[in-house]
């Protein structure tokens, strides 16, 4: 999840958006969810990933970071 969080931070900054901007776009009462996404403490829902991708002008797979080795159980 940490890699996904780093991607969200990078893409948000590249888009010139603040956390407050995303909070307003999503209509969240607080920015807590966005901070949790960025810190890798939580993942956005599929719906929110699609919205993030549209905001950033990328595809969902540009946001999600997956460690293939750990996903399929391969030791490095």
Predicted feature locations:
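A short, Lys/Arg-rich alpha-helix, primarily the initiator
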Residues: 1-15, 25
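DNA major-groove recognition helix of helix-turn-helix/homeodomain DNA-binding modules
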Residues: 47-62
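Short alpha-helical DNA-recognition segment
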Residues: 16-36
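Residues within the helices of the helix-turn-helix
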Residues: 9, 20, 50
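A short, glycine-centered helix-capping/turn motif at helix boundaries
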Residues: 15-17, 57-58
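Residue-level detection of the helix-turn-helix DNA-binding "recognition helix"
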Residues: 13, 27, 39, 68
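Short, charged recognition helix plus adjacent turn
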Residues: 54, 64-76
């Amino acid at each position: 999840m940490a890699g996904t969080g780093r991607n969200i931070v990078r893409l948000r900054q590249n888009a010139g958006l603040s956390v407050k901007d995303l909070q307003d776009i999503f209509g969240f009462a607080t920015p807590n969810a966005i901070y949790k996404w960025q810190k890798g403490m939580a993942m956005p829902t599929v719906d929110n990933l699609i919205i993030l991708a549209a905001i950033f002008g990328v595809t969902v797979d540009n946001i999600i970071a997956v460690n293939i080795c750990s996903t399929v159980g391969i030791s490095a």
